[in-house]
Amino acid sequence: MRVTVRLFARLRELAGASELVRDVPDGGTALDVWNGLAEEFPALAAYTKAISVAVNEDYARLTAIVHDGDDVAFLPPVSGGSGAANDGNE
């Protein structure tokens, strides 16, 4: 079966693409998709324990089973900001 993989931010930079199509065996999980990407793009492996995943635009666990035609998005950890809230009065 085939899934569309979407990568964001640093993950996109490391893979050199924001969208990929990959074959996954029947019964495969989001983690299987990720492991295939990490094998193809070894620099992604460093993010394995920190990524978030969404299947068909709903956050999911890496253990979620994916199906033919699914959209599987991987997002790196979010960081940044000044640490101070801006209430719009400045």
Task: Give a label for each model feature.
Residues 1-19:
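Eukaryote-biased recognition of intrinsically disordered, low-complexity regulatory segments
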Residues 5, 33, 69:
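Residue-level signal for inorganic ion chemistry
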Residues 12, 44-45, 63-64:
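Short secondary-structure boundary/capping segments
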Residues 17-48, 52-55:
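Compact, glycine-rich, soluble single-domain proteins
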